[in-house]
């Protein structure tokens, strides 16, 4: 199994495209991470929108550059709004990304996410346990936490990618991005990133934005993982703990975006 690495030039090119196109991302995400997700997108040069009412969600999915579905705080009314948005995104050819939070641990959200797969997401982003559960090869995870190493989920990610046509991202100490055939590994980051709520969910929003960019979508999505890990490393170097990490992380994302424009 060959795992390719992403070059700095590829990452910088994708970030230049990101800033140039400034995708409008319709984030139907969980209640815990909305502010952090919006600020992450803004720092990189995208435009976030959080539209959740069913009628409006469907309408906005046709306007947005990309749609994110994150099931972290799923309720039945929210599931209805998400389904309506995904159906409209499919009709409008708006790329959409699924973040199947805790799908391996809870039955209702697993059934819901499996139903959404029939609408062919452009990308799927999860930890190893979530990806393995969604692929039907394992049940597990400890809520939102993974109990599996990212590398162990590569076969499941490849299967899921081939079955759905999505680009699948498995995040962990090393992130793996696959279209079912090619695999790109992204190293970096810091364990402190796991002590801040929302870094994975925010990455899913950046992945969604990258689905709206021209060029090689696999490389663009892998670049999103690289930016987040780079920013995490820079932020940790300036931080004393999780509380001071967040503002330094947002600053680091902003600085990365500015550097490619220089």
From Swiss-Prot:
Cofactor(s) listed in the protein's UniProt record: Mg(2+)
Keywords, in A-Z order: ATP-binding, Kinase, Magnesium, Metal-binding, Nucleotide-binding, Thiamine biosynthesis, Transferase
Listed InterPro entries: Hyethyz_kinase, Ribokinase-like
Membrane-spanning intervals of the chain: none
A GO term, aspect molecular function: hydroxyethylthiazole kinase activity
UniProt-annotated binding residues for substrate: 50, 198
Enzyme class label: transferase
GO BP, sorted A to Z: thiamine biosynthetic process; thiamine diphosphate biosynthetic process
Metabolic or biological pathway, per its Swiss-Prot or TrEMBL entry: Cofactor biosynthesis; thiamine diphosphate biosynthesis; 4-methyl-5-(2-phosphoethyl)-thiazole from 5-(2-hydroxyethyl)-4-methylthiazole: step 1/1
Reactions that this protein is recorded to catalyse: 5-(2-hydroxyethyl)-4-methylthiazole + ATP = 4-methyl-5-(2-phosphooxyethyl)-thiazole + ADP + H(+)
Keyword Magnesium appears in the UniProt entry: yes
Enzyme Commission code: 2.7.1.50
UniProt-annotated binding residues for ATP: 125, 171
Family listed: Belongs to the Thz kinase family.
General function of this protein: Catalyzes the phosphorylation of the hydroxyl group of 4-methyl-5-beta-hydroxyethylthiazole (THZ).
Protein name: Hydroxyethylthiazole kinase
Encoding gene per record: thiM
């Amino acid at each position: 199994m060959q795992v390719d690495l992403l070059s700095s030039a590829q990452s910088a090119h994708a970030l230049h495209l990101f800033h140039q196109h400034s995708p409008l991302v319709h984030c139907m995400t969980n209640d815990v991470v909305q502010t952090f997700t919006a600020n992450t997108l803004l720092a990189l040069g995208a435009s976030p929108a959080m539209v959740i009412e069913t009628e409006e969600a469907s309408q906005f999915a046709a306007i947005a550059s990309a749609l994110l579905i994150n099931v972290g705080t799923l309720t039945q009314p929210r599931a209805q709004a998400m389904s309506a948005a995904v159906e409209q995104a499919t009709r409008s050819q708006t790329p959409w990304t699924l973040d199947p939070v805790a799908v391996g641990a809870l039955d209702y959200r697993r059934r819901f996410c499996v139903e959404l797969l029939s609408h062919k997401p452009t990308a799927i982003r999860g930890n190893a346990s979530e990806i393995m559960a969604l692929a039907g090869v394992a049940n597990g995870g400890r809520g939102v936490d993974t109990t599996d190493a990212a590398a162990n989920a590569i076969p499941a990610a490849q299967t899921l990618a081939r079955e759905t046509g999505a680009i699948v991202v498995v995040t962990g100490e090393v992130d793996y991005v696959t279209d079912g055939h090619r695999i790109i590994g992204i190293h970096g980051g810091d364990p402190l990133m796991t002590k801040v709520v929302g870094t994975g969910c925010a990455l899913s929003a950046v992945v969604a934005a990258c689905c709206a960019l021209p060029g090689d979508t696999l490389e663009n999505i892998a670049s999103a993982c690289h930016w987040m890990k780079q920013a995490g490393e820079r932020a940790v170097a300036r931080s004393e703990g999780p509380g001071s990490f967040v503002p330094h992380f947002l600053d680091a994302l902003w600085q990365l975006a500015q550097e490619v424009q220089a």
